[in-house]
A protein has these predicted regions:
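Short cysteine-rich loop/turn motifs with clustered Cys
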Residues: 1-21, 44-46
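Short metal-coordination and nucleic-acid-contact micro-motifs, chiefly zinc-binding Cys/His arrays
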Residues: 2-6, 36-40, 65-69
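A generic "alpha-helical surface" signal
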Residues: 3, 38, 42, 124-131
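Short beta-strand-alpha-helix junction that forms the catalytic/metal-binding core
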Residues: 9, 31-50, 166-171
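Short Cys/His-centered divalent metal-binding micro-motifs
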Residues: 17, 40-64
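Histidine-centered catalytic micro-motifs used for acid/base chemistry in nuclease
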Residues: 22-28
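Short, intrinsically disordered, charge-biased short linear motifs at domain edges
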Residues: 28-34, 57-62
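HIT superfamily nucleotide-processing domains
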Residues: 66-200
Length: 200
């Protein structure tokens, strides 16, 4: 069972080096589950404790989900063929510097799985991306004292401006004076909507 799981929790994807894995029934014996190889799964101790013996969810399906990649996708390709661009990663996500940065230090965060946008992420991927965002924010702040703020966001769908249809989150460092008037921030994605206070 542990060999089949390739050293990862079949729910959250964490490695057995980070958390001990446990083999347990998919369908609990208390619900009629059998002692059979097809009814076992490997979960980290946290996921197994949360599952308890009342849940019959087959978490092995998540392994296939997490491994999904697509041909001719820029961010799927980077993982396989351009790993030198990767500046940080964890089990389910990775980070690169933007190839066309808005400001110095502009960083992108992607799930390793191919998924079109933020709304297709599962919670463990959201968590994995957030961990990397926090880590990179800390590193950027420590390495560049001119950074005083950040814009963070994503484009979801063609009408929002998305051009690469593999979910990616932008972290854009901001410095005093990088624009004449920063008030309104992300509201400026729609012309004339940024300075809403002028319309009161």
């Amino acid at each position: 069972m542990l060999s089949r799981a390739k050293g990862r929790c079949e729910l959250c994807g964490i490695t057995n080096e980070q958390k001990m894995l446990e083999v347990d029934h998919i369908f609990p014996k208390s619900l009629g589950g059998k002692d059979d190889l097809s009814n076992y799964q490997a979960l980290c101790y946290s996921c197994n404790a949360a599952k308890r013996n009342t849940d019959d969810t087959d978490f092995r399906l998540f392994k296939t989900l997490y491994e999904h990649r697509e041909d001719n996708c820029l961010f799927c390709d980077i993982q396989a063929n351009d790993r030198k661009r990767i500046i940080a990663e964890n089990n389910l996500a990775y980070a690169i510097r933007d190839g066309f940065p808005v400001t110095d230090g502009h960083t992108l965060f992607m799930p390793k799985r191919h998924v079109n946008d933020y709304f297709g992420l599962v919670q463990s991927e959201v968590n994995a991306i957030n961990i990397l965002v926090q880590e990179q924010r800390t590193l950027l702040m420590a390495s560049d004292s001119s950074i005083e703020g950040f814009n963070i966001g994503m484009n979801c769908g063609e009408v929002s401006g998305q051009t690469v249809f593999h979910c990616h989150v932008h972290l854009i460092p901001r410095r005093r004076g990088d624009v004449a008037n920063p008030r309104g921030g992300v509201r400026h994605i729609i012309a004339d909507k940024g300075f809403y206070e002028d319309k009161k």
